[in-house]
Regions:
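GST-like domain detector, emphasizing the conserved glutathione-binding G-site
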Residues: 2-171
Length: 171
């Protein structure tokens, strides 16, 4: 657990993370590991094992929150919500008590990325799914996360959950 004396309070990197006059360019190189029913990538679907980190300010993250709710995965997949702002380093849990995610014990999502990849060179994006035993990011591939909720987490879908990715409609 972090204490006030060990937490970073340097907010000097707050502010815009895009250059004035330039469009936001989302990092599209994702951590593409998958959480699957059979665990073929080393990450099996297990109730209570993972935490979805999704900021409401991010449209890519909102689709995972919507899918989770529609499918009834609330009891098997917890959610951490960073605040609506992002500094140059990472999304922060500034809205949580003490500025720390209550489950992970992290003040920045970046810590989950570095727990798995100490020299992670890319953008720290949401949504991200974090493995709770290791507190390390598993994936941040927003498109695949949503598809996997629909196709790999079916054992945990609520009764009457919609089929969000019908086999007949797949390419």
């Amino acid at each position: 657990m972090t204490t006030e004396s060990t937490r970073s309070t340097d907010h000097s990197t707050r502010g815009a993370y895009v250059a004035v006059g330039e469009a936001f360019d989302r990092d599209m190189n994702y951590i593409d590991d998958r959480i699957t029913a059979d665990g073929r990538d080393g990450w099996p679907v297990e109730a209570g094992r993972y935490r979805l980190i999704a900021a409401r300010a991010c449209p890519w993250a909102n689709r995972t929150l919507i899918s989770r709710r529609l499918l009834g995965l609330e009891d098997v997949l917890s959610v951490g919500m960073p605040g609506p702002t992002h500094d140059r380093r990472s999304w922060t849990f500034d809205l949580d008590e003490g500025g720390v995610d209550p489950v992970l014990g992290y003040e920045r999502l970046q810590q989950a990325y570095f727990a798995r990849f100490p020299d992670y060179p890319r953008g720290i994006t949401v949504p991200a799914v974090v493995d709770l035993p290791t507190k390390a990011v598993v994936t941040n591939d927003f498109q695949q996360i949503t598809l996997d909720f629909a196709t790999e987490w079916t054992e945990h879908h609520r009764e009457g959950a919609p089929d969000l990715y019908p086999a007949a409609q797949r390419e």
